[in-house]
Amino acid sequence: MVNLLAIETSGAICSVGLCVDGNRFVRSEHVEKKHNERLLPMLEALREEAGLSRPALLEVLDSVAFGRGPGSFTGVRIAAAAAQAVALAAGANIVRVSSSEALSLAASRQLIDADGVISAIRSRRDLYYLAAYERTSDGVQRCEQLSLIHI
């Protein structure tokens, strides 16, 4: 089993997740543009909820994942910097995850009868990133390129 820390800050919601020995811990907050203020306290709260000391958390982590967008460029940089810092301290792998693919995968697991999913991620004001995914035996696969559209 992989012990994983996940960080997503590319949108208005700041999310962190930790999976250690099959136990899952998750925190999400609607923070708009305060990711830089909330991310580290959320990571600390997650670590405490998991009952791990700081050194113990760094010892058990195999990988650190972060949402690489699309979304806020500053938000992606915050997640990437935090993931890089934790992974470096833990000697863990860094994994970049497409935010639209992760969203589509989660939606496809809830929509049992759907053959595909379209993800829409707000960029700013009336601009949205859209991507179409089809369901596969092991998840989802993008079938239409990511597009930025005005709504």
Label the model's feature ranges.
Residues 41, 45, 84, 88, ...:
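Short, well-ordered alpha-helices that flank and scaffold nucleotide-derived cofactor binding pockets
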Residues 1-2, 12-13, 61, 90-92, ...:
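Short coil/turn connectors at secondary-structure junctions
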Residues 67-96:
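DPxDG-like acidic metal-binding loop motif
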Residues 1-70:
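N-terminal beta-alpha supersecondary unit
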Residues 52-58, 87-98, 112:
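Phosphate-handling active-site elements
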